[in-house]
Amino acid sequence: MTHNDSRPRATSTSQTTSQNNRVNISVPNANDLRKFWARVWENPVHHDDNANWLQIEQTRYLNLEPMNFQGIPVEVFHDVLKNLQNWKAPGSDNIHNFWYKKFTYIHPVIYKYINKFIEYPHTLPDYIATGTTFMIPKDANRLSDPAKYRPITCLQTIYKIIASCLSRIILGYIDKNNMLAEQQKGCRKYSQGCKEQLTIDSVLLKQTLKKKSDIYTMYIDYKKAFDSVPHSWLIKTLEIHCIHPQIISFLKNTMTKWTTRLRLTQNTNTIITEPIHVQRGIFQGDALSPLWFCLALNPLSHMLNSLNKGYNLPYKENNTEIRTEFSNYKLNHLLYMDDIKLYGSTQQELQDLVKVTENFSQDICMEFGIDKCKTNSIKNGQRYQHQYHMQTGSLIEALSEGEVYKYLGYNQALEISHKDVKDSLTKDFKHRLNTILKNYLNSKNTSKAINTFAIPILTYSFGILNWRKNELKSLQRTINTTMTQYRKHHPRSCIQRMTLTRKDGGRGLIDILNLHNKQITNLRSYFHRKALTSSLHKAIVFNDNKITPLNLTDKVQQRNEIQINNQIKLNEWTQKALHGRHIHDLNQPNVDKIASNEWLKRGELFPETEGFMLAIQDQIIETKNYRKYIMKLGNSSDDSCRKCKSSAETIQHVTGACRAIVQTDYKHRHDQVAAIIHQTLALKYKLISEKVAYYKYTPQTVLDTAGYKLYWDRTILTDKTVHCIRPDITLHDKKQEIVYLIDIAIPNTHNLSTSHTEKITKYTDLAIELKTQWKVKAVKTIPIILSTTGVIPYTLHTSLKLLDIHPLTYINLQKAVILNTCRIVRKFLSIDAPTTIVLG
């Protein structure tokens, strides 16, 4: 029941690994686990209805226009379904979001029942409000302690749909009336969340250190915040914010049915407890809970703001050269969900702020986690240690010398230690990168894993930490060099292709420098835009003069905002003498660039194979010619082919022009492509009944039925002498009286056009002869041509259309060619070759 927010959670793979390697680990049994959490959730409490501040809060919004609610609008319902994540963990019903999204026939029924449940809350079945709570260890060394687990509850999908619909409606009303305090960034639409709070916090702390002035701060942490908030206060919160009575009635009734079972899995053993009836705390795992919790703490912001105390941020209303009077913005707290930081100009001010927070917390029956509450103050630009005595008698200690506090994901002392945090992030980034590359993912999933698992550990720091350009480029190089270590990238391949999109011929990795600069731009734009209407943001923009990486005072575009778009990378790739040959081939008018890059877009090959094929396309394979003229090695005076000895050993020669392997390796590649066409036609005309993998398919010489006859590599006898009488495949359509002469060619890319013309010319005489001899209406010559590197000419699509076979058949043809070309090059280089770098 911990809330679901966007803050990074600390994870330790080493701890997890050691935990999994231990066999006999003591974990709580089902009774102990249930007993502990039942004490938390089955212990109902009631907030203080007589609190003085509550009387003020209950009248705050009375003059607002009442909330209009006549059931869930159908457009909201459909939008919620559309945005569901397909395979997110389901509840105890085990029905994933995917089925609710795709079974559109039942949408009207679901919509009808959702509105019925809201109108008549007692009709809601109990099982819909039942969850399964997974217990996630917080500390691998204290697995026996039930308190050291984080409860994550998976709710029924239908419950989450209802909650999402209500959340959108409630949030729309809250935003429309600007009810949520500006200091709260949890659940605030279009805000920058934790980054926004950290930027504001950095400006305050660094300005204080720079001016050698005073600031008194305290970190407040609630003890099991989401698990301890009273149900009575949750309902009162909705009433205070004027939420429609029908919605309140539904939620109030639903809360009485909240039930969950705890589930703890350790190695192969799974513990499932008896049900716990949740009478305190709030479920996590749905869209409504975070917003509901933020509303529960919203009165605290109003109470703190009403004190008119806090740290003074001077700013000018109009930041121009014209003399303008300074204004002051008093900031006394920042909130992100339940993470609270208080700010005072004096120690007494801080104590007043803490006292208000403590009183509010006591009135709503929530407790401070004293061990996680700390003071962290600066006096005359130096650390100042002081304690705070709570009304309960507990003592909040100061951060000691050398101690840090993890605030919104970052360790702070007087300020964030950029170097230490960057070193830690880089270490974690490399660890995740290695973890990904050790696994046997296909190419597309490898790139996706790097983009979504490794790089995001850096992303959160962009705009907060001061990353230099060379550091970001070094991180990008780390991806390349690590992939090279795992034989998944050639060290001399075109670097632009690594971060180009797959449809453009790249590998689809995120450009870390671009990502950083884009986030800087977005954050700067956000603060400048908010400064037009918000005094807080205006004050931050005014005071951030090279204090944070955003440098908000300067409105001119910063160097760390410049981005290199795809077109610039494509131009750089094109201008390269060697690497640029492939993209030059792709840009020829007879080549389908999109289809030629389809194998990359699909990403089905292993990354070793993909990396090797890109190296072949980039022409940086260590052939003898490459070693002599590009690497210019002194011992490479002879560049003649190691096989045929008749031509220079270039990569084009190896892939498609060496006479020594025409009847072996080239023929094997040719026959596999031909086999795909043969099997496709045989299945289409029901000459065979079973489909097998193309590399296992052995075509029969003749397949014949009453309507069709299919020849494989068979000589056609003619009455007159014809030189070319053995096409790869011959299809005789007896019904339509048409003969198709199908011939396969896999030339090097620069020979695509001439190969097509040669094939048409080659069988012209045979076509004329067969038309008369077989008494058919037409004889059509169908060349099936694609290049050795998988480049697809437009003529291939025309040929497939003439044969009336599926237009995407070219994908299998392309895959077969690429795999065989890689096999040919590997085999070729392994024969009497000097030391070469071969991937895969």
Where are these regions (language model features)?
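Conserved pre-motif C helix in the palm subdomain of viral-like polymerases
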Residues: 144-177, 193, 199, 223-226, ...
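Active-site metal-binding core of divalent-cation-utilizing nuclease and nuclease-like domains
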Residues: 631-635, 687-741
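Basic, alpha-helical interaction scaffolds
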Residues: 393-469, 487, 522-535
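Short, conserved micro-motifs composed of acidic
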Residues: 265, 367-403
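Conserved polymerase palm-domain catalytic core
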Residues: 222-352, 371, 378
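Conserved catalytic palm subdomain of right-hand nucleotidyl-transferase polymerases, strongest
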Residues: 86-95, 133, 144-154, 195-239, ...
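Surface-exposed loop/turn segments and immediately adjacent short secondary-structure elements
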Residues: 1-146, 161, 395
